[in-house]
C-alpha cells in the first residue's frame, strides 16, 4: 500500500477519536506547515497534524522502505516541535513496520508513541 493510503487511514483513525483541525499531506486536505533545520536545506512536512484538548500533535507514518537517515532527522525535528508546543509525536506503523518503528525511536532516543494501524 502507498504511503498516501496509510495517511488517509490515519485521518480516519483521528476523526474517530475526536481530533479536530486535522491537516494532512495528501490531496483533499489542507497541507500542514513545513519545517526545516538550520543545518539542512531539506523541508520536512508532517504527514498529519491534529488538535485535541488544546494540544497540537504530529502523526507520522513510518515505513521501513523509506530512507532511514531522512526519517530520523524528520522525527527528531517533529519530536522537538511537539515538546515545545506541549503536544505529542505519534508514529503510525502499519503491519510489518511496528518493530522497526519501536527499534528506531529507542536507538535514536526519539520521544514518540508508536501506534499500530491496519
Please state what every model-predicted region is.
Residues 1-4, 16, 21-55:
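Active-site metal-binding core of divalent-cation-utilizing nuclease and nuclease-like domains
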Residues 92-118:
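Domain-level recognition of nuclease-like catalytic cores that cleave nucleotide substrates
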Residues 79-86:
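Arginine/glycine-rich "motif VI" loop of SF2 helicases in the C-terminal RecA-like domain
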Residues 10, 74-78, 101-104:
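A general structural detector for well-ordered alpha-helical segments in enzyme core domains, enriched
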Residues 25-28, 61-65, 92-95:
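Structural motif
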Residues 46-74, 78:
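Conserved catalytic cores of phosphodiester-cleaving nucleases, focusing on short active-site segments
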Residues 1-12, 90:
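A short, highly charged nucleic-acid-interacting micro-segment common to nuclease
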Residues 55-58, 86-91:
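Hydrophobic beta-strand segments of well-ordered beta-sheets in folded domains
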Amino acid at each position: 500500500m502507498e504511503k498516501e493510503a496509510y495517511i488517509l487511514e490515519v485521518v480516519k483513525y483521528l476523526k474517530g477519536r475526536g481530533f479536530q483541525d486535522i491537516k494532512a499531506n495528501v490531496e483533499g486536505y489542507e497541507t500542514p506547515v513545513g519545517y526545516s533545520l538550520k543545518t539542512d536545506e531539506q523541508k520536512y512536512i508532517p504527514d498529519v497534524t491534529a488538535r485535541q484538548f488544546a494540544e497540537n500533535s504530529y502523526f507520522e507514518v513510518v515505513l521501513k522502505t523509506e530512507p532511514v537517515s531522512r526519517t530520523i532527522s524528520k522525527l527528531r525535528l517533529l519530536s522537538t516541535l511537539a515538546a515545545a508546543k506541549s503536544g505529542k509525536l505519534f508514529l503510525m506503523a502499519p503491519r510489518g513496520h511496528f518493530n522497526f518503528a519501536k527499534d528506531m525511536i529507542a536507538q535514536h532516543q526519539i520521544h514518540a508513541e508508536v501506534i499500530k494501524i491496519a
